[in-house]
Amino acid sequence: MFLIKKRYFFSVIFLIPFYLSADTYSVNDKLYFGIGAGIISPNDVEIKTTTAQTANNVAFSANIDGEFEFDNGYQITGLIGYRLSDSLSFESEIGYSMFDYDKLNLTVGGTATSGGVTFTGGANSSHVVDGSISAFSMVFGPSFDFDFNRKVELVLGGGIGFASYSDEIKSVGNSTGLSYDEDQTDFAAKLKGGLNYSLDSKSFIQGDYGFNFVDSSIDNYTSDFTAHTFNAKFVINF
């Protein structure tokens, strides 16, 4: 799937610990919920064609080489976790991400044709892209926590799941020759690390960084989608 279509998205979070030997929160309360928001920073997506082909209903010429760049966007997340022990939890995180395309940078130029209109990009050229990607994601996996003191914990986790995204390009360089609107669902994975700060025995704030992957590549066209996320969440135990 057009890597750049990855709405990824992706992105999605899923970590949270529990009381180790400190009173960060009560280990008797095994179930916890969280909600948060943050920033998603997508990496560039490579576009490369060795032969002429059609992808996303757009006909591309052979030997195109370049990359799509994206603006930073926002992410809203929800978290449900269950403590298996004092230092191990299993979590499910859902997320909604939204970000815009920035530009298409071409090292080797070529053409793209859609709806009877042809976009032509020269070698070593850059073109403004009017488009966006939005994604819903869900990831499941373990989370480990390590106490620093009675208030602060280090959290490490990861998981696998899916990203369902909508990828739309309206125009490139004021031409609709490379325009499309596609919906895809792909495998997604995430690695995360962060800190928990206890507010009381029932709640805490979590700040974390995540590296997100979406298996969205298209053979002879685009690479997979990856992105960095930075989030803050409020979590409460039940």
Where are each of the predicted segments found?
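Short glycine/proline- and aromatic-enriched beta-strand/turn motifs that initiate or cap beta-hairpins
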Residues: 22-81, 235-237
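Outer-membrane beta-barrel transmembrane strands
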Residues: 68-83, 87-93, 131-143
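Outer-membrane beta-barrel proteins
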Residues: 22-24, 84-86, 142-148, 197-201, ...
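Residues on the lipid-exposed face of transmembrane beta-strands in outer-membrane beta-barrel proteins
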Residues: 35-39, 78-82, 138-144, 158-162, ...
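Short, contiguous, well-ordered secondary-structure segments
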Residues: 21-34, 133-159, 209-213
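Extracellular/periplasm-exposed beta-strand and loop segments of Gram-negative cell-envelope proteins
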Residues: 42-72, 97-137, 163-186, 214-227
